[in-house]
Design a protein with these regions (language model features):
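Short helix- or helix-capping micro-motifs
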Residues: 38, 126-134, 182, 186, ...
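Membrane-interface transmembrane helices that cradle and orient dolichyl/undecaprenyl
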Residues: 16, 20, 117-120, 159-175, ...
């Protein structure tokens, strides 16, 4: 593959836009800035991500995936299971789990700095771009949990860096790197398909459409397809469960649907109001500048696609570092133009202006940091939310909790497992041997499977999402400890039952339901297992 580190234009004189995009050497890379900001990002997450809270519901699910490595899952591409497997290899602790997204976040800061440099940004633009990503609330939240969302912007911005180099140098061979990163991105999260679609449409809407007459972009597409193929084959073999899952979510109205204005409003809030001038100036510059218009159109197409599809607002977040990098270059240029060329001021005065701009961004961004990192215990976080008048937006219709959902979903799991263990271990040994655990949700099943062994609990089974494929249990149980069953289900399927109250103040409201000991199960779990599943 062609080298990504080559700063000079490529000698490929046949490129369709070679002459228009030839440039001189890139600005010097601000290595000290890059190292300092990446270190700050990493240390921030190391010191906050394991304080006061526990495992996130989805993290428990991914740890179960890590014990069942496969080329696909009902609601996830396969790489998330590999990340979790690495965390298990490192001990499976919360710290081992959370160091991976922290590293991804630090890498994203570095990549954003490289994009700003590729766009012609000097030392200040590189610093502002990296700082903006470091302080962006949406990015801080994503990098505080082990989910595919922490890694998604890394793959996308890697692709954008490649596109920017192609636009600057005209070296079409670099599409091979795009294909590699896009293929890995598809194995990380399927929404990379929409990102790739947006890039394709953006190219077709500009004079760069001529790139499709060359072989490199098609070879890149073949590379991406080859990397994505194992997951496609898994989907075919399992009759496309991901499509069924998405259809169920839409049909059941699980997610809050935002109108166009509300969608834009949530973007501004979550990216950070103080960063609006940064990313908006980047978007305007991209759309107005013929050379970088592909980048602006990529964002525009993707944004419209997500709004029309009524996607969750965070689906757009991975593409913003590109705009923050562009905006940083615009601001650097504007300051230099205003203070040096028009006013004839000295370099020292220009530095004062740039430092003032940085200070404004830092101090205006700080109030959001406690809301998206785990630095405050729940009582103080509630008090802080009330003090600043912050009310977290709901992403799901049935979300009921005192705290934002990403935080509430970290509460109550060890306590719930302890309660199940108390029920299980209170049974006589012969009855215990005939008692299984049925969880209604992958979070409960994952918690039992993570914390249960220390209590001697058997593995929990569930028909929720991919857990359905990991069943049925190897034996027919006479009794079940059931979590997230309604009372009617218990009465219909148990000869007798006992209810045990379960309550967690800061957890999700849906978890505050009784745990039941169901004696004399009236069905054969192995026979009914494959009759239905719960995908939503």
């Amino acid at each position: 593959m062609p080298a990504l580190g080559n700063d000079a234009p490529a000698p490929d004189i046949d490129s369709p836009y070679r002459e228009a995009n030839s440039t001189g050497p890139l600005p010097r890379l601000a290595v000290g800035v890059l190292v300092a900001l990446c270190a700050a990002k990493l240390l921030l997450h190391i010191f906050t991500s394991v304080r006061h809270y526990g495992y996130f519901r989805d993290e428990l699910y991914y740890l179960d995936m890590a014990r069942h490595l496969d080329w696909g899952y009902v609601d996830a591409a396969p790489l998330i299971a590999l990340y979790a497997r690495i965390a298990l290899w490192m001990g499976g602790s919360l710290a081992a789990l959370r160091i991976l997204p922290a590293l991804a976040g630090a890498a994203l800061v570095a990549l954003t700095i490289l994009i700003a440099r590729e766009l012609g940004g000097g030392r200040y633009a590189q610093f502002l771009a990296g700082l903006s990503v470091l302080l962006c609330p949406a990015v801080l939240l994503a990098d505080s949990l082990l989910t595919m969302n922490a890694f998604e912007p890394l793959f996308w911005m890697g692709c954008i860096w490649v596109v920017a180099r192609i636009l600057r140098t005209g070296d079409s061979r670099l599409w091979l790197w795009f294909g590699l990163l896009a293929g890995l991105g598809l194995e990380n999260k399927h929404s990379t398909l929409s990102f790739g679609f947006a890039v394709t449409v953006a190219l077709l809407l500009t004079h760069h459409r001529r790139e499709f007459a060359r072989r490199w972009i098609w070879i890149a597409a073949a590379i991406a397809l080859a990397l994505f193929l194992p997951n496609i084959l898994w989907q075919i073999r399992h009759h496309f469960p991901t499509i069924e899952d998405l259809a169920n979510v839409r049909r059941e109205g699980k997610n809050v649907v935002l109108g166009p204005l509300a969608f834009v409003k949530e973007q501004i809030i979550d990216i950070g109001p103080i960063l609006l001038p940064v990313w908006l100036s980047g978007l305007v510059w991209f759309l107005r500048d013929r050379r970088w218009r592909v980048l602006g159109l990529t964002f525009a197409v993707f944004f419209v696609l997500m709004e029309v599809a009524h996607a969750k607002n965070y689906y757009v977040f991975p593409i913003y570092p590109m705009l923050l990098a562009g905006g940083a270059v615009v601001i650097e240029s504007a300051i230099e133009s205003t203070f040096e060329r028009r006013l004839g001021t000295r370099a020292a005065q220009t530095q004062t202006a740039t430092r003032a701009a940085v200070a404004i961004i830092v101090f205006a961004s700080l109030p959001a940091v406690p809301l998206v990192t785990w630095m405050l215990p729940p009582e103080r976080l509630l008090a802080y939310q009330n003090a600043i008048g912050f009310k977290p937006a709901k992403a799901e219709v049935h979300h009921e909790s005192l705290l934002p959902q990403p935080i509430a979903d970290q509460f109550g799991w060890p306590e719930m497992v302890g309660e199940v263990a108390a029920i299980y271990n209170s049974l006589p040994p012969d009855e215990r041997a005939q008692t299984g655990i049925w969880a209604g949700n992958y979070g409960e099943a994952g918690a039992i499977n993570l914390f249960g062994p220390q209590y001697g609990l058997p593995r929990a089974y569930s028909r929720h999402q991919t857990h359905w494929y990991w069943g049925p249990p190897p034996q027919v149980y006479k009794n079940l400890i059931v979590i997230q069953w309604g009372l009617d289900d218990v009465r219909d399927n148990c000869t007798s039952y006992q209810a045990f109250e379960h309550y967690q103040r800061f957890g999700m409201g849906e978890e505050n339901q009784p745990i039941y000991l169901c004696r004399g199960v009236t069905f054969d779990i192995q026979k009914i297992w494959w009759h239905s599943h719960h995908w939503n």
